[in-house]
A protein has these predicted regions:
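Short beta-to-alpha linker loops that shape the active-site pocket of alpha/beta-hydrolase fold enzymes
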Residues: 37-44, 105, 197-198
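Short coil/turn segments at beta-strand junctions that form active-site/ligand-binding loops
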Residues: 1-2, 70-73, 97, 161-162
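Gly/Ala-rich beta-loop-alpha elbow adjacent to hydrolase catalytic centers
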Residues: 77-82, 86
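Catalytic nucleophile-loop/oxyanion-hole region of alpha/beta-hydrolase
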Residues: 14, 41-71
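Short, surface-exposed "cap/lid" segments of acyl-processing enzymes
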Residues: 1-39
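Glycine-rich His-Gly loop
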Residues: 6-10, 80, 168
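Aromatic pocket-lining residues of Rossmann-like dinucleotide-binding sites
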Residues: 26, 89-90
């Protein structure tokens, strides 16, 4: 069997359009797909397990769950900080065979400043399929402290599995030049530089389809 684990970006729901789109197409391609609610944040609203370290444990647990089925392929596909986590997990977990990193940040040095005086940071996210509704999450500084323990730029230096890095050239959240830092350190990555697309391509079905078509090309290699 072939397994694909989909990793949302910062505070993103696993039920956002892009992940649902990827799920449907990957299922058609014969993958068993799970869209992970990282740290169970959307399920519980509790940020206690919302750290990269817990995300890695969660990914490890899901891979172990399928071990008896002897998957010949395990793909980690993440967007934004989910892409960051996918690379870190892929570099550490032997069973992972491919990584798809969409708009991954090289670090969160600038974003960390949004946690004023190292307190909690409150953010609002739209509810899937209900754009007029929202949920609010308060993330403690412990998230930043944990995140800073990981370096994706260092991780890719010793990463020799197939790696796709997707760069949205109109991205203003994770500027292309930041993601290019990862590309420079990586070993022969499959790089897609998509013009006229921003970080939140999830809000457009057409853009989601474009991204999925690029993912499909990579998986077929």
């Amino acid at each position: 069997m072939k397994l694909a684990l989909l990793l949302p970006g910062y505070l993103d729901s696993p039920d956002y359009l892009h992940l649902v789109t990827f799920d449907k197409r990957l299922t058609q391609l014969g993958y068993t797909v799970e869209r992970l609610d990282l740290g169970d944040l959307w399920k519980t609203g509790d940020p206690a397990k919302y750290t990269v370290s817990h995300f890695l444990d969660q990914i490890r647990e899901r891979i172990a769950y399928y071990k008896s089925q002897k998957p010949e392929e395990i793909v980690l596909l993440g967007h934004s900080r989910g892409a960051f986590t996918a690379i870190i997990a892929g570099s550490r977990l032997a069973g992972v065979t491919r990584v798809v990193a969409l708009c991954p940040p090289a670090d969160i040095t600038q974003s960390a400043k949004k946690w004023i005086n190292q307190g909690s940071r409150t953010s609002t996210k739209d509810v899937p399929d209900k754009p007029s509704e929202s949920r609010t999450f308060s993330i403690p500084y412990a998230y930043v402290q944990d995140f800073l323990n990981y370096s994706v730029v260092e991780a890719v230096k010793t990463f020799h599995k197939p790696l796709m890095i997707f760069i949205a050239l109109s991205d203003r959240v994770v500027p292309p030049e930041h993601t290019e830092q990862i590309v420079k350190s990586a070993n022969n990555p499959h790089v897609v530089r998509q013009p006229n697309m921003g970080h939140d391509f999830r809000k457009s079905q057409a853009d989601c389809d474009i991204v999925m078509s690029e993912i499909e090309k990579f998986l077929a290699q």
